[in-house]
């Protein structure tokens, strides 16, 4: 039965994702908080928060789900040609706070951002605990793009990305999936397909299939050096 659950601060357990509403697609629960334990529990079970600034906390598990398999990303010839001309550098976990702040910047066609200071602090706590990570794109020591998300076993749960220079967020996504493949990750959760992700080859799979993959991979192991502060390269 599809129904909406209401969480209180003491209730850590989420209802099964299969109970999420059909419309709006994937809305599962309302309320609770953004404590690290609750956030980790959510991602471990295929659930993520998304809500506007004036809304209560909303928890989602949409059907279908957007995913990438590291190593299978689609890169157009024109994008390869463009990126080969750029003298950009790429780093892991060098500027997590700056990346989340970049993702929170207002974008064209949007009234505002859902990434509030509360959201930024919640994911910063997860970063300090070793669960949330960032990838940065630099041009002449200036941050021009990046992304952040959570590592859950062999799954990377992407949260948000941004760019201040054309194609910088696409470059970040390409570098991320190449890095994840090298480190032993098997899946990237991209949540919901959009034109930007679709252009990179994101696939839509049924929620049930995603949850089965997640259950198989969420306790898997990856390289211990996966999230060491480092500079990484792009392979084109």
From Swiss-Prot:
The Gene Ontology terms for molecular function here are:
leucyl-tRNA--protein transferase activity
What EC number(s) does the entry state? 2.3.2.6
Q: Where in the cell is it found?
A: Cytoplasm
User: Where is it found, in Gene Ontology cellular component terms?
Assistant: cytoplasm
Enumerate the UniProt keywords alphabetically.
Answer: Acyltransferase, Cytoplasm, Transferase
Listed GO biological process terms? protein catabolic process
InterPro entries listed in its UniProt record: Acyl_CoA_acyltransferase, Leu/Phe-tRNA_Trfase, Leu/Phe-tRNA_Trfase_C, Leu/Phe-tRNA_Trfase_N
Going by the record, the broad EC class of this enzyme is: transferase
Q: Which Gene3D superfamilies match?
A: Leucyl/phenylalanyl-tRNA-protein transferase, C-terminal domain (3.40.630.70), Leucyl/phenylalanyl-tRNA-protein transferase, N-terminal domain (3.30.70.3550)
Catalyzed chemical reaction(s): N-terminal L-lysyl-[protein] + L-leucyl-tRNA(Leu) = N-terminal L-leucyl-L-lysyl-[protein] + tRNA(Leu) + H(+); N-terminal L-arginyl-[protein] + L-leucyl-tRNA(Leu) = N-terminal L-leucyl-L-arginyl-[protein] + tRNA(Leu) + H(+); L-phenylalanyl-tRNA(Phe) + an N-terminal L-alpha-aminoacyl-[protein] = an N-terminal L-phenylalanyl-L-alpha-aminoacyl-[protein] + tRNA(Phe)
Question: What family classification does the UniProt entry report for this protein?
Answer: Belongs to the L/F-transferase family.
Q: What exactly does this protein do?
A: Functions in the N-end rule pathway of protein degradation where it conjugates Leu, Phe and, less efficiently, Met from aminoacyl-tRNAs to the N-termini of proteins containing an N-terminal arginine or lysine.
Q: Which NCBIfam families match?
A: aat
Please report the name of this protein according to its UniProt entry: Leucyl/phenylalanyl-tRNA--protein transferase
